[in-house]
């Protein structure tokens, strides 16, 4: 944390160009091993005029423009660079306070990954700049130092200049910087992942995590919705949330700002502030390269076919596409130019079509090597995409990869990924989608012979039926638009042609768009309730209400024991919990087919369900009966390796799309620092399990505790199996490095009970959290009255830990001060201590904290109810009620000395039995606002998590 005495660097608005160029050069050097041979001045890429104008607007008004209109290839990803520099200016007092977080939201998973990767690369460059202590600090280092001043962490780890986040799958993967709430941050998200969190119902999140994630993504945040015309409902929803936040109490920080970025605006609101590219005004020297892109050579070639029907896997489309690819390859090979990459792009409408095209190219030996054609679709497992990116890093840049001759893709490549194809083959799609696909060709305008072939029906009359995911009217309009473009003297699909003859907007998939109102938000904010049924967010998030748009995921594991109880035990252990990295994205239709699958003996293989952070065994219905369970968006099924076929070319597909030869899959390895040993899966049982033979699980647990070292922890199953010689042996055990263990519990309930060092006294912990809360509030610029309320709440947030049952669980000395956390315990020891304690299952210490403070009104000030709320919700529970009443919470004889049991019981009955707590929650939400209260709770939780992370 930057202390008040630390001098901040000097940064001026005029240095944005140098920052932009320096960051671009640093990224280029990090991604390319070969040195840049161009003259130094030619190497520098300065911002375009429109990018400078956006920064000027932010610096002048303290808010982002509502809309950015910029054609494909004009550098919309620079919103990240602008965000970082604007915050650096704000940090040194050279610009007004602006949102600390930027969330780039885009509707393709691969694009979200691309945005996240770029953010991580920028972070790497800035961290490297901080280590350069030679001479006068350059602009990168000064910006990094300015951004670093927003951090409040104080441990052995150096603070980052900014944080990154990434939510693109069906699992909550702890990839949001909720603990560093004051930091500048860049977050990449899909529309569903962002939108569900904006409405307090984060897909894949635990109930306790929901309010914290909502606060992070909707307060002190600018959400940039890329290609907003593809997500009109989400745009309406987030804009309405931003409006309603203006009715809430003013905390002194920016509320949600929403920016739509697109080449085809989705609204015609004349009151919106719009900035962007004017293709008629590109005379500035800095716009020379942009002019090359806008007027690049992209010849349009229409290829009509008789048997076009818009269906997946259409053989005529596949054959015509393969034929066009062959001609492009022959042309490129004849033209030489082997020193440059000339990758041919192919973008089609369906995964089945993409798979068929790749299979045809490989089968017909169109290319010398199968590896020369790569498949890229949105339903790839992140682990597989990582491997592809690591193997072909330059493929995902405008430089290109010479070893890849063809990329076959679906809509994944329509938006945002910085590929640069020499030529493109695509099939008829809505005009706005085609415009995006055309943008993947000759992006920099360097080529003079690039062509775009569009496979289309022989006649517009052939487009009569919908061809999901597209409507007939949109395809028909696109056909007419292409004919108009083709009628020009030199048919082109470059950005200038798109401006002169704009693509026809797709027809709305809904008659009316829904906007959330105040009562909706109050209801959604009841995040800890157990409703009969979760609200269907499609109404507020999706342009289409088709149920099949809902997504889930599939995971395969090769190390689960056949004993289902032992397998559940592994999956419920935090180290081995499902992760987004190993999840195959799949729609609910695919998941349902997996559930219905029977092997050759008519047996349904076992499946595990991961939903909202909880693991359960899927209960298949008996023959002739309906299952009592049903799938929901965000559900993830876990399968044993090979038990159910569901992939083709490594992509989750329907059963009718399966290949004739079964796909070979591999399970994703566990992170570094974790090693799992399962008896029945172990290749060398004599070596790995010999010392545990004949021991009960309890005896093994004690032995493993003694074997744990300062750098490694060992945990074991509480279940046993029968060894080959008939002796008892544990089902599994694991070795975990302490660094991995510390990371796995950060922010969890377990972190509230242990540190991996010395015990922590309760008074010390609460004072530290209160002080960190004060620092956070000051850093954020919170209004003083709310800073005081937060500090009071933090000072007493763990009072409930004084309960003697909790102290016994921590192993506290009755003659010494109360503990906040035990010391020198592994996670496994903490779990065992809790299970053996006198505390009932589900008991919440923060519920008792709120009660004890409510019984001592002298401890709280003006905002009494707000303080109580922040205390009671300090771990995400109690919104709007707690699961347990006064009798469950209190037990006579276990209260700390000085507390009157009867008086406290009476107060607890009033709060948790009669309903005063529910009323308190309702009133504070109405008085302060659901987003404001969630944000204040999140600040206190961040302070608590930071102090715990630092071992206090």
Protein language model regions, located:
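Conserved Walker A/P-loop ATP-binding site and its immediately adjacent core
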Residues: 97-124, 128-142, 192-196, 231, ...
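Inter-Walker segment of RecA-like/P-loop motor cores
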Residues: 127-207
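Divalent metal-dependent catalytic cores for phosphoryl transfer on phosphate-bearing substrates
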Residues: 477, 753-759, 778-952
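Interdomain hinge/linker at the junction between the two RecA-like core domains of SF2 helicases
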Residues: 251-257, 261-333
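SF2 helicase catalytic motif II
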Residues: 192-250
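Conserved strand-helix element at the start of the C-terminal RecA-like helicase core
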Residues: 101-115, 119, 332-363, 374-375
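C-terminal helicase lobe and adjacent C-terminal extensions/tails of nucleic-acid helicase motors
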Residues: 330-341, 356, 363-397, 429-430, ...
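Conserved pre-motif I regulatory segment
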Residues: 3-69, 82
